[in-house]
Amino acid sequence: MSSHQLPACVIDNGTGYTKLGYAGNTEPQFIIPSAIAVKDKVASSNAQALRWNNRVGGAGIDDLDFFIGDEALSPAASNYTVKYPIRHGIVEDWDLMERYWEQCIFKYLRAEPEDHFFLLTEPPLNTPENREYTAEIMFESFNVPGLYIAVQAVLALTASWQSREASDRSLTGLVIDSGDGVTHCIPVADGYVIGSCIKHIPIAGRDITYFIQNLLREREHTIPAEQSYEVAKTIKEKFCYVCPDVMKEFVKYDTDSSKWLRTYDGINSITKRPFSVDVGYERFLGPEIFFHPEFCNPDFTTPISDTIDTLIQQCPIDVRRGLYENIVLSGGSTMFKDFARKLQRDVKRLSDARLQMSETLSGGRLKPKPIDVQVISHKMQRYAVWFGGSMLASTSEFYQVSHSKAEYMEKGPSICRYNPVFGALT
């Protein structure tokens, strides 16, 4: 069967989790931790030489002895070393990454790679050399017929189109991508990332979990120590929200606590006895560290709204309004209730204050045009990058712009240094 008749495989490799599935679907078929459990000697940096020695000695079976995803973190892999091939979005161990992709394709997707085109994602500022390594693995190890490497921020912009009118769809915008390990603010102009203006915020989902864990540790002694992180993570996902004003929220809880308090019920994994946790201020203080980072990190005190405003002011002047008008949220850590509303309010205040200052400094001669700040949240926000890839890989034009195996054999891996933004995006 022609590889054009079968849907493309879309794989979004993140620091914490990997999303994989087939093009045309609205959600990934599998979401698994980006972890791989291997035997110690294979996990060493000299893994290729060790594997060669094993094969010569007839012990190459060790090469196949590994787990990925949830299995890598399960008790069954307790005698293995757990490795994370991706750090801050960038692949650091290509040998382990190849084995990880191997099981993604054969065990999870159950696909023959020779029969499917592949769309893989990359973080902003990924190096051209990393694209070449990806191409070598995909074309030489898996013999794929075609490959396209897409920037995650552009796919997140594309995913936001589903909830908007065709006339409102734009490839100029600011993507706030906040996952488990890091938050990126990425400006995109006409489908291309403005690399010099990207900002990294050292606060993400994991930091919120740690912050809630510390708050609970101070007053809740019923939580088993070995379960405190998972309890904090569950509380974050079930009960947390963003409030418009922290001080007023404290007053609300103190005035009528029964209305706002929640209870988390759990089972001690060792004694099997039930325990309960009262969840109060943690509900709104957790996500608040995006807007008041000094709550948890004294070395970083810039609110996310200030970072966004500063970033946009550093971009070329002709795209600034387009960026303010299209701030798109992506990733699980942007899913808190009212996160978009508060972010829009705070960025609007900053931009209005700047316009007011310009008018004052001009003595009233300048009347700046108001800036329309729009923060876009949508149903596909959690898996925005994967969904954007699924949308693009299901178009006929995807097959025309993907790099083919024949191209690779003729020109080498350098062809994948450039992946054009194609018509479906423009």
Swiss-Prot record:
The keyword ATP-binding applies. Keywords: Actin-binding, ATP-binding, Cytoplasm, Cytoskeleton, Nucleotide-binding. Its main location: cytoplasm. The keyword Plastid does not apply. It comes from the Eukaryota. One of its GO terms (molecular function) is actin binding. It is found in: Cytoplasm, Cytoskeleton. Functions as ATP-binding component of the Arp2/3 complex which is involved in regulation of actin polymerization and together with an activating nucleation-promoting factor (NPF) mediates the formation of branched actin networks. Seems to contact the pointed end of the daughter actin filament. Component of the Arp2/3 complex. Belongs to the actin family. ARP3 subfamily. This is Actin-related protein 3. It comes from Caenorhabditis briggsae. The lineage of its organism: Eukaryota, Metazoa, Ecdysozoa, Nematoda, Chromadorea. The gene is arx-1.
